[in-house]
Amino acid sequence: MDAFTRAWYALERHYQDTCHILLRDRFAAEPDRFERMHERLDGMLFDYSKNRFGEDTLQLLCRLAETADLEGKMRALRTGAKVNGSEGRAALHTALRLPDGADAVYADGRDVLPEIRRELNRALKFAHSLDDGLYQGITGKRIADFVHIGIGGSDLGPAMCVQALEPFRRQISVHFVSNADPACLDEVLCRLNPETTMFCVASKSFKTPETLLNAEAVKAWYRGAGFSESETAHHFCAVSADTEAAQSFGIAAERVFAMYDWVGGRYSVWSPVGLPVMVAVGGARFRELLAGAHAMDSHFFHTPPRRNIPVLMALIAVWYNNFQHADGQTAVPYSHNLRLLPAWLNQLDMESLGKSRASDGSPAACKTGGIVFGGEGVNCQHAYFQLLHQGTRLIPCDFIVPMTAQGAEDGRSRFTVANAFAQAEALMKGKTLDEARAELADLPEAERERLAPHKEFPGNRPSNSILLDRLTPCNLGMLMAAYEHKTFVQGAIWNVNPFDQWGVEYGKQLAKTIIGELEGGTSVHDASTEGLMAFYRECRLKGGGAA
């Protein structure tokens, strides 16, 4: 039996030996539990004391990480080794946020930092030219709106950042279009003036069908407004790894910005894919975002596992996913401006870790990626928190809470923070049947006994609390990088590749065939798919409006 398997079995035995210990009892027996089980990094505090484990558990989890060669895999990530084995690529998103003066970073034998610096500076300069009015629309009017057309990693990260940093927004309004459903683009275009709008087409391959369909629809919008092809091109820029394809689409080379084969889409907001963030908040704020992410990178690469925030986040996730058989995990930002964070995390975690094959192609040896969902607190308390508190499923929760409001401070911010703290405490402590009876002491005994079971809360429901002193570009960068590295560590322990996404491709492949077949002709599919296609054609014949 190898060392990793022994470490795994030790954790399984440990769970059986300790699963009866309640969190409320741990806190009662360990007055210093919070002091021992929280970490701070600049403006961030990570509290993991409300989890179903003790110091002995953490030691066993760290041993598991050691036997999985986490240290070696982290070194490979940092130094440009081809950690994305199925595609034969490095994953150098951390290089995108290195400060000036950093040591060389190599991919395929060449230092990538000069290229990173060049493209970042080009994108920042272009964003500044829009903001300053130096680059104007073809009719000489200032650009007032910037529309980013992308999907998946080219959309979720930038959209989340722009929303999160709304208080830092400058004068240009930034919009996002991702879905190929015509309503997605139409609801944006109806508010815009073609003379004062810049469109950015973001696609790593410049073959993404949803993105190109929307870009072509924008061209048609300009034609309908009387613009020539060259006049329309003046209102386009692009971000792609295939810069020649972007230029073939009609976008001038000086407005095509490079992204890189060695950065996956869901890790690309730090590259020129972050152009809408640069436009929204300015170059200085974007550099603060990069600096925050780099601060977390430095912490991750140079801090021992027991004090390492992303490593701890990952080990906790592995503990629940593999040894306590949790049914999922939820992330709840108690900040209106962070309301898109759960969608970004959903892609980051589930697209990265939703793998049934190990890195070498063999079947995965354990349960891998979990179901990640979430929503905006306090709203979630009036939705799915009932299941968290009294349901039969184990779903650990991350509470992400800025301490300072970004709006008017009139008591609502304090209310929001108080609710986050209260929910975490309620999940941990629960309410015993006797405590429920005591609350109902004024009722007749029969009524008290009838109601008390419904007011009992099992408790012992785990959570992490991630507190930010303020929601700033720097703190947002730290938060995002922490979750990126958490995802990497989980992949390292489960021995899956978190940087590919072959499962996304198969449906796209079938869709290419079905698109043509929807208009009629020969098709050979299963009976269900044929029936769905027949209903589509029926609706078209009746004038149902499908397109």
From Swiss-Prot:
Keywords, sorted A to Z: Cytoplasm, Gluconeogenesis, Glycolysis, Isomerase
Active site per the UniProt annotation: E351, H382, K508
tRNA processing is among the record's keywords: no
GO molecular function annotation: carbohydrate derivative binding; glucose-6-phosphate isomerase activity; monosaccharide binding
Catalytic activity, as annotated: alpha-D-glucose 6-phosphate = beta-D-fructose 6-phosphate
Cross-referenced InterPro entries: G6P_Isomerase, G6P_Isomerase_C, Phosphoglucose_isomerase_CS, SIS_dom_sf, SIS_PGI_1, SIS_PGI_2
One matching Pfam family: PGI
GO BP term, example: gluconeogenesis
Domain of life: Bacteria
GO terms for cellular component: cytosol
Pathway stated in the Swiss-Prot or TrEMBL entry: Carbohydrate biosynthesis; gluconeogenesis; Carbohydrate degradation; glycolysis; D-glyceraldehyde 3-phosphate and glycerone phosphate from D-glucose: step 2/4
SUPFAM superfamilies tied to this protein: SIS domain (SSF53697)
EC numbers on record: 5.3.1.9
Location(s), subcellular: Cytoplasm
Entry-linked PANTHER family: GLUCOSE-6-PHOSPHATE ISOMERASE (PTHR11469:SF1)
Record-stated family: Belongs to the GPI family.
Function comment: Catalyzes the reversible isomerization of glucose-6-phosphate to fructose-6-phosphate.
Name of the molecule in the record: Glucose-6-phosphate isomerase 2
Gene: pgi2
